[in-house]
C-alpha cells in the first residue's frame, strides 16, 4: 500500500490549485488526506502528527504531468536495439522515483507502462507518482505508433508482450476491437495517433492518420467503458479530425491554426503542449545520444512553430494541461515545462493551474490537483513566494515534496 502520514504544515502561503489565497495558512494532512485548511495560527498540533514550519514557503498541490512515458529512455535513439528487453522495467523504477522527487505526484502515462507498473506503485513496491496508464499507443498501419521500420526491423520501444498488446489497428471494426483489447489489458485511458510524428522514421508530423470515423469509433468505445481518449496530434488536419471525433486532449498541437483553435474552444478540448519534447531531442543529439538525423532535423524544424502555436492557443483561451513527454527527454526534469509555459506568455497562476487542477480534471480524478479537504495530501513546498517571483526559474527553487503527507 502507498505510504500515508499525519502532518501539520504551518504558516504557508497557498496556491490551492485554483488561485493564490490571501494571507498564510495551516494545512493538516490526516491519514494521507487533507483534513483541514485554515488561516495560520488556527490549528493546534496533535500528538500524532509531524509539524512542518513552512514560513517563507509557498504550497501548491502536487504537480500533475499529463504526458510521460515511464518505461522509455531517450525515445528515438538506437540504444534500445542492443539492450535486454526487460531492462525497461528496471529503469522505470528510477524514472518514477526521480519524477516524484521533481514534484510530480500524479501522472498520465501516454504509452509503455502496463497495468503491472500501476499496481506496483499502488502496492508501494516502488515510489513514484499516482499513475494512470494507456498501456500502449494505438496507431494505424504505417502510423506514428507502428514500430515497423523501413529496414523491416521493428523498434523495441513499444514491443508487444503479455499485458501490452500491439497498438496497431485499421478500419472501424479493427479499432473497435483494439480499444476493447487495451481496456482488457487495464488501460485507464486510450492514446491514439491522429498524425505522424517527429520520432518516427517513415512519416511526417503534418500528415493525418486515422479517419474521423475510426477516431469516433475509438472515442465511442472508450466512453462506453468510462475512459477518455488522448491524441498525439501535430499536423493541422489530424488535430481537427481528433477534435471533431471527440477526443479529450490534443497532445503536442504543433501546427494549430485559427479554425482548429476555435474548434478546440467549442468542444472544450484540452491542449497538452509538451513544449519540452522537441528541445529534448535536440539536446540529446547534441550530447551524443544516437538519434537518427532525420528525427533530429524534424525536431529543429518544429520547435519554434510549436512554441508559436501554444502561445496562440493560450491567448485564445484554450484550456491547457501540463505534460512533458518525459522519456523523450530526461526523466525528473518535469518542472522545465512550467518554465516553458511561462515563456509563451502564461502567467504564474495559469501555469500552476495547468500543472495541477487542469490535469486532475483532464484525467477525471477529483482526488488530486487541489489542496482541499478530502483530497490526497499531495503537495509541494517551494521556497519563497511563487506569486511574487513566478515560475520562470522554478527548477532552481528549493522545494520539498510530499505524497499522502509523506515527505519524499
What are these regions (language model features)?
Residues 125-294:
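Metal-coordinating catalytic core of metallo-dependent amide/deamination hydrolases
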Residues 12, 27, 32, 56, ...:
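Divalent metal-coordination and catalytic microenvironments
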Residues 57-123, 141-148, 213, 237, ...:
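Metal-associated gating/positioning segment near the N- to mid-region
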Residues 93, 100-101, 183, 243, ...:
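Non-catalytic positions within long, well-ordered alpha-helices that form the structural scaffold/packing
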Residues 12-15, 353-357, 373-408:
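C-terminal cap of metal-dependent C-N hydrolases
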Residues 74-77, 119, 201, 239-245, ...:
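Histidine/acidic-residue-rich catalytic or RNA/ligand-binding cores of hydrolases
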Residues 224, 289-294, 300-386:
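His/Asp/Glu-enriched, well-ordered alpha-helical/loop segment
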Residues 1-46, 57, 385-393, 406-407:
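N-terminal metal-binding scaffold of metallo-dependent hydrolase/deaminase domains
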